[in-house]
């Protein structure tokens, strides 16, 4: 009940996004709600909204913060990757045959298109870590064509720019795509 109420109140303040994330934690009998949004509010507006929400919700500490870029990307993937073949979920998804993959490098602000056979990169130099997700980026597998992978990458890059005003470069990994 409190979450629906909270979202309704946030909408009244003009704070709503499909990427809104609300963390609700109880610690030593105290309740804390952190509202993560991809946009930035000015600090006066932020404090006013936090105070109003705390008054309305009684005995709850409220904090509004900016959603970290990597969390934003994961929410985007959760909403837009149909087979959930990204990050650690890849282990649980069946992927066979030739497919195209994206490495979303949030550290270096780029998305790199690769070619895979099932869950294995065509060239060893494509995937240097045994993990599908690291502190620097995340893998998305299973695109049926290079064009579909590129289209997905462009849409993600547009969303990132819309909320964070960060340009992500889209590159093709030459070593594994040179035959195409």
Curated annotation (Swiss-Prot):
Highest taxon above the source species: Archaea
Protein name in UniProt: Uncharacterized protein MJ0426
Species the sequence originates in: Methanocaldococcus jannaschii (strain ATCC 43067 / DSM 2661 / JAL-1 / JCM 10045 / NBRC 100440) (Methanococcus jannaschii)
